[in-house]
Amino acid sequence: QVTVFERDDRIGGLLMYGIPNMKLEKWVIDRKVDIMKEEGVEFVTGVNVGKDVKAAKLLKDYDRVILACGAKNPRDIKTPGRDAKGIYFAVDFLKATTKSLLDSDLKDNNYISAKGKKVVIIGGGDTGNDCVGTCIRHGAASVTQLEMMPKAPDTRAEDNPWPEWPKVCKTDY
């Protein structure tokens, strides 16, 4: 018997709330969860392990406990004005949008809207790009993404011949 405890109200963790629907439609996750349920896996939502249920109880009730808790704490930056209104962490922004989309097709307004806003996203990679795409879908007035990278060369390197794309500028979205 396998039991999965999920902190959120839906199964899937980062796949459910951290990756926008434009990249991963949630019916795919639901289908996988249904297959696991058919195989006997039990899912319990709304349980924050360590807070709602203690390790001692889990060790008493189960033969093995596997921690797959995911990253919950965002990486903050220390800069003057960081605590100003309108600054959000990426995962909070993405999660709120996805939850509102799944709950009400964004009609409940329980998300951080970028509609009509000039948005700057500090950070890159998949998470930064997911924020860019989500802001565009919200109808942001403009979206700028800043990412710390090594300085791009001014000219094409000898080991980067035509017809390959020149490696002089990076744009992810």
Per-region residue spans from a language model:
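Residues forming the flavin
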Residues: Q1-Y173
